[in-house]
Design a protein with these regions (language model features):
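Specific aromatic-rich, kink-prone transmembrane helix
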Residues: 107, 126-127, 145-162, 173-175, ...
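Membrane-interface transmembrane helices that cradle and orient dolichyl/undecaprenyl
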Residues: 113-118, 151-170, 178, 281, ...
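Extracytosolic helix-loop segments that constitute the early lumenal/periplasmic catalytic or substrate-binding loops
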Residues: 26-28, 43-66, 73-76
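Transmembrane-lumen/periplasm boundary regions of multi-pass, lipid-linked membrane glycan transferases
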Residues: 44-50, 177, 186-291, 295-312, ...
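Loop-to-helix entry region of an early transmembrane alpha helix in multi-pass inner-membrane enzymes
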Residues: 68, 72-76, 84-103, 136, ...
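Short periplasmic/luminal acceptor-recognition loop of GT-C membrane glycosyltransferases, typified by
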Residues: 406-549
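Short acidic/glycine- and proline-prone juxtamembrane loop motifs at membrane-interface regions
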Residues: 94, 132-146, 183
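Transmembrane-helix signature of polytopic, membrane-embedded enzymes
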Residues: 13, 17-22, 108-129, 147
Length: 556
């Protein structure tokens, strides 16, 4: 056994980048296999599947209607990874995200090692301890390609005697790539981060060369988008694109959201990053950490312009948070006047925490299983994920036995946390939000009849139902809404008057808070509401009811 371990470690030392990339990709694939898409990823899965039945255009579609919030490039990649729509599941739809995520983490290691031997290893370890980062990678991480472009650009800029003309061409190509993936936001974020890196590096010739290239590329991309959208859909498509991609991104909000509010989201990765900022001193203005901070803060400051507030937009900055935190661990020191007794206590406590983390994560897999029994039917629990996570953590503990250095202990702890996220926490969330049991119950009760939703947003709730049924069945799902509800063109919305004309004794799905309103509307039509059962769509519970005629009293 020891010979095998030595052979594997020898190969890993010789081909570290490939080892990190393929190891992470394998773990991500195993962790996502068999899981259901949840939250916003359900919408992305639905859009990917919709490409099979509708022409592929500049935007993904829902029932053939363009959804202007995203270009279709990432969805085309996902559609190809589903074998052109033949296997539409979480692990196939999110395969491009997992590839870009594994690549970004491997490139984070390479950037750190290029700057200083050993720093890349610490940056790699810190990349494994952010649940939000992993959650994005194992979901439909539409911002991960932009993240991959960012680390690629910085890795290229680290090369000695780099030709400015060549690097400018690569930068321009990456801007086009980001525009194709993320629309105008993609190249703007990449350009801001790269500008921050160059400014803190003092490379002003490259800075102005990139700035000129960026302005030309962005203008060209917007001009091409204007021509393409007018050619495909006329003024209407361009106006919708402009509204969704520009106006909706500037809808107001706290300017401190990304600078302050998002830091807890990426904990515990953000802890060493904050330590670096506090203890780094004047060294923060110098290479290598200065340019990394320049990249990160340029992105965060740009995002802090009041607008849409989603932490996933910060994905591009995460590798540089890990790199800065790794530098702080190795070099930043707080000048605390502590006695030797207190220093010894702190060291002992830190060592104890690192020793306990692997065993805590093994216990955590068992705890996730036990807790899941209270929220999920036993037949829907991801037993295989919990078992595999437990075994992988045990294997990691075995492989690191006898290694007592701080680096080895931190490496073991970070590996165990990453495995715990992938094989315990994320599967537990997926199982807890799995909509299949409720959908199957509704389908069994309704047979071939239509299904109605009452006062529920189709884009957030109804799509969780639609994603679980086939294309033919989706055409039999309708959404009844009163005047207080916003309607969208993508779904089969009906007003109360229209919906009640269609409605017989079919199943109606609603939240309990709307039961009284539905009862009043039904009473006006001499019908009564009969509850059938309840269940979950996502993380909320919903009622399934029928409307049946009121019993007419017999004449005396």
């Amino acid at each position: 056994m020891s010979n095998i371990i030595n052979a594997v470690s020898g190969f890993a030392r010789k081909h570290t980048f490939a080892t990190v990339f393929f190891s992470l990709l394998t773990v991500f694939l195993l962790g996502s296999a068999g899981l259901e898409c949840v939250k916003i990823d359900v919408r992305f899965l639905f859009m990917t599947g919709d490409m099979t039945d509708n022409p592929i255009g500049p935007f993904p579609t829902i029932f053939g209607n363009p959804y202007y919030d995203y270009p279709s490039t990432m969805f085309i990649l996902s559609w190809l990874s589903t074998f052109c729509g033949h296997i539409v599941a979480r692990w196939t739809v999110t395969l491009p995200s997992m590839i870009f995520g594994a690549y970004s983490i491997a490139m984070t290691w390479r950037i750190g090692e290029k700057a200083e031997k050993g720093l890349g290893l610490w940056a790699l370890m810190l990349s494994l301890v952010s649940f939000e980062y992993f959650n994005s990678i194992l979901g439909f991480g539409i911002d991960l390609p932009v993240c991959a472009a960012g680390v690629t650009m910085v890795a290229l800029l680290q090369e000695d005697r780099l030709n400015i003309f060549f690097s400018t061409l690569v930068f321009a190509a990456l801007l086009v790539f980001c525009f194709a993936i993320r629309g105008p936001m993609g190249p703007v974020l990449l350009g801001a981060g790269t500008a921050g890196w160059l400014a803190m590096s003092g490379r002003w010739k490259t800075f102005f060369s990139f700035g000129a290239a960026g302005a030309i590329v962005l203008a060209g991309c917007v001009g091409f988008a204007w021509w393409l959208l007018h050619h495909v859909g006329g003024d209407e498509m361009w106006n919708q694109f402009y509204e969704w991609q520009f106006n909706n991104r500037m809808d107001g909000g706290s300017v401190f959201f990304y600078l302050l509010g998002s830091l807890p989201t990426y904990a515990p990765l953000s802890v060493p990053f904050l330590y670096t900022l506090i203890a780094g001193g004047r060294a923060l203005m110098k290479a290598p950490v200065g340019p990394w901070l320049g990249f990160l803060f340029a992105v965060e400051i740009l995002l802090s312009i009041p607008g849409c507030q989603h932490t996933r937009y910060m994905t591009l900055a995460v590798p540089f948070m890990a790199l800065s935190g790794a530098w702080g661990i190795l070099h930043a020191r707080l000048d605390l006047k502590l006695s030797e007794v207190w220093r010894d206590r702190i060291v002992r406590l830190a060592r104890l925490v690192l020793v306990l983390i692997p065993y805590a994560t093994m216990l955590g897999a068992v705890v996730c299983l036990i807790v899941s029994f209270f929220f999920v039917a036993p037949e829907w629990l991801p037993y295989g994920h919990y078992a595999l996570g437990f075994l992988l953590i045990a294997a990691a503990v075995y492989c690191f036995r006898g290694h007592d250095s701080w680096t080895a202990r931190f490496a073991l702890a970070s590996c165990c946390l990453g495995i715990h996220f992938v094989f315990a926490v994320i599967p537990a969330i997926s199982a807890q939000e799995d909509s299949r049991p409720f959908v199957e119950a509704v389908e069994k009760a309704s047979g071939e009849n239509r299904v109605f939703f009452f006062n529920l947003n189709a884009d957030h709730v109804g799509i969780k139902y639609l994603a679980e049924v086939n294309n033919a069945r989706r055409k039999q799902v309708f959404f009844i809404c009163d005047e207080d509800q916003t309607t969208e063109e993508h779904y089969a919305y009906r007003t109360v008057e229209e919906g009640f004309r269609m409605l017989g004794s079919e199943i109606v799905i609603l939240r309990e808070k709307y039961l009284e309103k539905l009862t009043q509307l039904a009473g006006a039509m001499n019908k009564k509401v009969v509850p059938q059962f309840e269940g979950k769509l996502g993380h909320r519970r919903y009622l399934a009811v029928r409307l049946v005629p009121e019993e007419t009293p017999a004449k005396p």
